[in-house]
């Protein structure tokens, strides 16, 4: 009794030519994927550095704008008060950076009220000096 064979020609599993071809392609694929990963990482770092630099520059510009706007406002308030003949002075304390309002008597020049008062400004100046020395 003859048994019919329904199977195809059986090839040995893992022939050398197939393995060699696959491993050569695998090495090339790995190298190109590593290079792509390195390129992506470098691009990401460059974008992050650019973002940080832009944020720092923007913060510095805003700080300059705030200082100039505040100085302009102090000048405008002083002009307005002098135009209505009231003795009131606005200034920015240099050491503490705080805005100061001084109300004084026109005839004598005596200070009636200062906001914040001189003692508080002195405390703020000392704290600022301590911070700078630390």
Curated annotation (Swiss-Prot):
Comp. bias regions, Polar residues: 1-18
Signal sequence interval, chain numbering: none
Pfam family, one: FlaG
Gene3D superfamilies recorded: FlaG-like
Residue numbers spanned by region Disordered: 1-49
Superkingdom, natural source: Bacteria
Record-linked PANTHER family: PROTEIN FLAG (PTHR37166:SF1)
Family: To FlaG in other Vibrio species.
NCBIfam families for this protein: PRK08868.1 (NF006465)
Protein name listed in UniProt: Protein FlaG
Record organism: Vibrio anguillarum
Gene name of the record: flaG
